[in-house]
Amino acid sequence: MEGERGTALMERLKLEFYYGQEAEQFTFYRLPKALITDDRFKDISNNSKLLYGLMLDRMSLSVRSGWFDEENRVYIKYSLKSIMADLNCSKMTAVNMLKELQAIGLIDVEQKNGLANIIYVKNFVSGGDEA
C-alpha cells in the first residue's frame, strides 16, 4: 500500500494499554520544553531538537565520568557514526543537525589535537544572550 508521498504505510501494531504503575516504567530523554515553545528555536528542525536532547542525556554520563575541561566545563564525545545510529539517519543529515545546533549556539564543537571532536552542550536558560 502506498501513502500520499509514495512511502509504504506502516502496519498498525496490536499493543496493550498502560495499567496502574506501568506508566512509570520507562526512562526518558530530556527535551527542554523551551525548544518547542520559545520563538528563538522555532526554525530549528525537530530532528536537531531531538539530537540536543540526546546530547543532554550524554552530558549526565560525562559528569559521572569526570569529563570536564580546564575551565570546568562539561563536554561530551558523540561521533557522527553514533548520531547516525541513534537517530537512524544519513551522514549528511547528522552533519546538518550538528551544523544547525552550532549555528544557533546550542553547542560548540572543538577539535582537540587530532583527537575525536568534543562537544560542549550549551545552557540556553542560564541567562545568556537573547538570540
Each language-model region and where it sits:
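Short, amphipathic alpha-helical interaction segments positioned at domain boundaries
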Residues: 125-131
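Intrinsic disorder/low-complexity segments enriched in polar/small residues
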Residues: 3-5, 103, 131
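Short recognition helix of helix-turn-helix/winged-helix DNA-binding domains
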Residues: 1-81
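Winged helix-turn-helix DNA-binding recognition segment
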Residues: 59-121
